[in-house]
Amino acid sequence: MKIGASTLAGIEFDLEKSLEFIESLGLDYAELVHQYPAERIDKDLLESYNLKYSIHAPFMDVNIASPQDQSRLNSIKQIESSIDLANEVDAEAVVVHPGTSSFLASKYFKKEVYEFSNRSIKEIGDYANDLGVMATIENMPNFDTMIYQDIHALNELLEEYEMYMTLVIGHANHAGYSADEIIFDSIKHVHAHDNFGDDDAHLPLGEGNIKLNDIINSLESKNYKGIYILEVNDFDSIKKSYEYMKKNF
């Protein structure tokens, strides 16, 4: 079982502090949140740690579903820079958000927003494939601005495009899915965090009401070979979540 942690837990600190902590726990993988304040990441720095990597493409002020051409194209360009980084450091996956829909766009142009997202996802997937990088798309939580909260619709799109999903366990729970509704062959990467279904809280594993054992055992029974990234709020939560994984699996 491959287990790692996201640098999101230490986003307010220097990247080195997060990587040092993740390495100190004995984890094998770190997922680099490739946006401010870590927009520029030194390959030599990464190679100084006994870690392997995945990349989370930027999502702050980035929207690949934007109806505005310049915003959408700039967002795709930023994500392509994360794919370039993944190629340079031999990262196992790049994680991409499918985009958001503003109030006005949701009211008048919801169909078009999904069409723009789909077009962008295909473009990103093609760019990644050309470099031999695996791009994955997240299922999203139950917030008004989020698209692809419907995990089944996302899976259908990714199957059509021959692309892959990052299953975000906490997002699926927040969107109302049970453990037996969210296992697909398209899943090649996992973000693990807990909640009570009322918020996307990113709690340590075991501190919410998600049936984590059922989900992870189902993935393992399908011969899942990807990484389980602990995507929680702080360093202590990484430690608690890693202890949960070691105790239960």
What is the meaning of each model-derived region?
Residues 71-164:
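Active-site acidic/histidine proton-transfer and metal-coordination neighborhood
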Residues 29, 54, 136-137, 166-169, ...:
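Generic enzyme active-site microenvironment
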Residues 61-67, 102-107, 197-203:
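A short acidic, helix-capping loop that chelates divalent metal ions and anchors anionic groups
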Residues 60-96, 207-221, 229:
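Ligand-binding grooves and catalytic loops that recognize ribose/phosphate and carbohydrate rings
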Residues 6-10, 33-37, 58-60, 99-101, ...:
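Active-site beta-loop-alpha junctions enriched in small/polar residues
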Residues 47-61, 117-128, 156-160, 212-215:
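Alpha-helix-loop-beta-strand connector modules within alpha/beta enzyme cores
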Residues 1-2, 12-23, 91-92, 147-155, ...:
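Histidine-acidic metal/acid-base catalytic patches
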Residues 1-83, 87, 164, 248:
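N-terminal pre-domain/capping segments
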